[in-house]
């Protein structure tokens, strides 16, 4: 689709997980003489709350692969196990949840879900809180 997005990783060669990037403002023009900068149109934050097969851990930090090796043992994901809820309290998931919740609670926020079964109570609680905000929109695909 060609929309610009932020997935929580920063850098060019070796993209490292940086939860602070969810707080960055992405603007069209870096002209410092302007009083008001215009945000990049159609920009969105992407939260992979359960991790991704394109993430790996190296010396305690989380990085993004530029290719996906499905047979790799170093992927960073939450698998559907009895330890799932405890895993969500660890890095990087705790940062993702905190930033995800903060984004949901902003006025005029929109959540687009793709392939989510709504079977995770900890995520559903965040969505239910957001649904109490009159300007919040939920789109389920």
Model-derived segments and their meaning:
Residues 35-38, 42, 67-68, 82, ...:
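Generic structural signal for short, flexible, solvent-exposed coil/loop and linker residues
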Residues 16-22, 82-85, 110-113:
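N-terminal start-of-chain detector that recognizes signal peptides
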Residues 10-12, 75, 81, 87-88, ...:
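Residue-identity detector for threonine
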Residues 86-88, 94-141:
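SIR2/sirtuin-family catalytic core signature
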Residues 60-98, 103:
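Flexible internal linker/loop segments at domain or repeat junctions
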Residues 1-77:
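Extended, H/D-rich, highly charged conserved domains that either
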């Amino acid at each position: 689709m060609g929309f610009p997005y932020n997935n929580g990783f920063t850098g060019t060669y070796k993209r490292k997980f940086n939860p602070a990037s969810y707080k960055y403002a992405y603007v069209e023009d870096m002209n410092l003489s302007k009083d008001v900068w215009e945000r990049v149109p159609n920009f969105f934050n992407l939260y992979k709350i359960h991790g991704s097969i394109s993430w790996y851990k190296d010396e305690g930090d989380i990085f993004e692969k530029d290719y996906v090796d499905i047979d790799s043992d170093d992927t960073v994901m939450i698998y559907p196990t009895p330890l799932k809820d405890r895993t969500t309290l660890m890095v990087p998931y705790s940062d993702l949840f905190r930033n995800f919740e903060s984004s949901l609670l902003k006025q005029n926020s929109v959540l687009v879900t793709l392939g989510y079964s709504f079977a995770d109570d900890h995520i559903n609680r965040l969505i239910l809180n957001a649904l109490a905000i009159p300007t919040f929109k939920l789109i389920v695909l």
